Amino acid sequence: MVVKIGSSTVVGADGKVNRAFIGGLADQAAALRKLGWRLVVVSSGAIACGYPVLGFDRKPVGDLPSLQACASAGQCIISSAYDEEFHARDLLTSLVLLTRHDTARRTSYLHARDALLRLVELGVVPVVNENDTVTVDEIKFGDNDTLAALVSCLVSADLCVTLSDIDGLYTANPHEDPTAEFVPVVHKIDAKIIASAGDSSTSVGTGGMITKIRASRILMTAGIQSVICSGEEPDALVRLARGESVGTLFDPPAERLDIAPRKLWIALGDKAHGSVTVDDGAAKALVSHGSSLLAVGIREVDGQFAEGDVLDVCDPRGMVVARGIAEADSDVLELAAGRRQDQIASNRLLADLAEKPAIHRDNLIVFA
């Protein structure tokens, strides 16, 4: 089981670590072990508990060196809290700090996987966070919801649980709409589900419900169940392990249970360097038939990217339906966009795309 803990859950508004919460989490980890479960923790909070001890009265947004300094100081504080509380329950923790750079290359992605699996095998509870001390925008995961999805795929988790200040998904923002209804189970994440997420980011964190939904979509694609629930829910992890219903469950379809590891790396390892928008016919061919993406189906190209870079594939309504590795650079695909097959074949600059796909099906993962 992977559990992701948001900044506002593990760190109070005063910047102090919530030791009572971490102690309760350690109690649950000990109980889970007796039930045969192993736990990996993805914990935010380094910057949130670092800025007060460095003399800032608020998070220094926009000041990258100061944010990195806060992360460095805060990571020591929060790691010590985990170590002390878990050690008191005879559990050993370890610290794993990752950046997008560590997973963008498949070799280092696999090394990260092997290290995490070995730690779990040895009975250790890994505490994972993004290495905010060295990250810049180009190599950031951006939020720990995405990082938790990555870690869940790395260790082939049975369940990923997000403990937050939100008790689950609603049809609208319950703080603004009194008619909002709680959603106990989600079987498919569509545009309606994404629209209902809105924006619920907090003052101490970087995520919101929309980032949690996107992470859950990746997990559903990987065939991994995920849950969003409140960090104040008593014994949530133990109850989930026993099969109880807590929060909102994102339940993947059975046919998604055997995704090739390399395709999961495409979905998670590197960020998208650009995107292509395809017509409805191409989107249907990808989603329903597992086809390669042909250049003739591309309508728009966004961003600058090279052959071999990872791209998002969007349908005409802007929904990301797939991600894959480009067989041509952005200049070539932009030249091909909107052209008929005969026009592509007759253009000497596009001749290769008449013979090969823009993204081959073996290098393409379709999202659930």
Regions found by a protein language model. Name each.
Residues 1-368:
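C-terminal catalytic "cap/lid" subdomain
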